[in-house]
Amino acid sequence: MAYIQKINVKYHDKEAGSICELPALYTEKGVVISQIRYLAWYSSKSESWKERSIFSLKLLLTYIDVVPNFENSTLLLKGFTKALLVGTIDYDKMDDELGLYWKARKPRDANNILFHITHYSDFLALQEGFDSSRINPFRKATSYEERLNWCAYYHKHANVFLNHLSNQNDAAFNAKRVRFIDRLLEPKINNEKAMKFPDEHFEKLLYIGMVKGSTPDYKSQAMTMLLNYGGLRKSELFHLYVSDITLHPIYRDEALVRVYHPEIGRSPDSSFANRREYLLESTFYKPRNTYRLSERLYAGWKSPLLTNKDGYFEVIFNPPEKAKEFLISWVNYLKYQRVEPAKTDTHPFAFTNSTGAPETIKNFQRIHKRAVKKIGLEVQKELGTTEHGHRHAYGYRARQLGLSQVEIQKAMHHKSSLSCLVYIQPTSEDIRSKMREIK
């Protein structure tokens, strides 16, 4: 009986002389080698991107394996796309002839899966020996590799999945062609309410929720201030070094916080080329965005807009005076509560746990959730009471201050001026209030 399992493998790149750990698919016929080479080629992609790629291909292989008597691969791939969108269950008969029992997916999710399969198919079509690898007709192909090469072939020559256009001439030519499967239409949804943490409860969260007995939890307070007053993404907290937080050279009672790229940012030790080299050669750690998604030390990196050649951006506190409050919590944390790393396990990360090891996202989420509940709020993304709600609050306040879109882009470290729109759009109530003011 066929089976497809996700495993982790170590891939040795002989040309680069490096070894990396990658997710892979293991079947009854062995490992899908082409997928490993594909992920190794795109090794700089995030762990979540790699996991999603593996997940998408696993779905395709699972579907290919259960479809009986596949004579036409184009129809097979078209059926796969339909199965993603509407599911495979016949609710009239309460049965599933394929035995997959897939439920319908949202168009956005289905499109994401098709994107990853398309991207992988494009990679296969460019490999040396691609033409000879399809020596067997699709219906007689026995290995997953052969079947995937045929999928790539049909995608390349018939635009089965997505239609990528390289220039205007290609666009004009392809506009005359009938595509078998176009990108699934997604309904346009404009979130009615910004998912921002309620401003009226934030002080309570800091000074009531984040208190152990009668002792303030300075670490949690400082981290949460960086989210709400500094507009940082949650993951960016866990790339900070102690040396990244200093006194502002001009405003001496305020903190200056710089967030460096976890790999190419300038090392705190000038004898190392960058932070990646510094961590690998002087500690037992590595840049936290390079850990596997399933590892507790993993922290993502969203590629924010860096503003200095040393590979960092500066936190812009909003309101500006909150840089003073943050500095107080940060200094108190360093003086009274930070557990220093063991001498045999040193590291530069700013926030540590009770043993001195680097703090983790999961533990911070647990602390934040407990604090929110302590002040009587429900923890829901839709209510803005998760960690990400603070960044929304930051962007919303920036708009209320009258900052321009470009200024908000700079403050929130977006590469595109359009990216900040999701954080600053007015609610229906905002518009009603504005209209009432107009007389």
What are these regions (language model features)?
Residues M1-K45, I250-D253:
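Basic/aromatic DNA-contact patch characteristic of tyrosine site-specific recombinases
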Residues W41-R147, C151, I367-H368:
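Non-catalytic DNA-binding core/recognition domains of DNA-processing enzymes
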Residues I64-V67, E340-P341, T346, G356-A357, ...:
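Short, basic (Lys/Arg/His-rich) helix/loop patches that form interaction surfaces
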Residues K204-Y229, K234:
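Basic, Lys/Arg- and aromatic-enriched nucleic-acid-binding interface segment
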Residues L240-E325:
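Conserved tyrosine-mediated DNA breakage-rejoining catalytic core shared by Y-recombinases
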Residues M412-E437:
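Catalytic-site neighborhood detector that most strongly recognizes the C-terminal catalytic loop/helix
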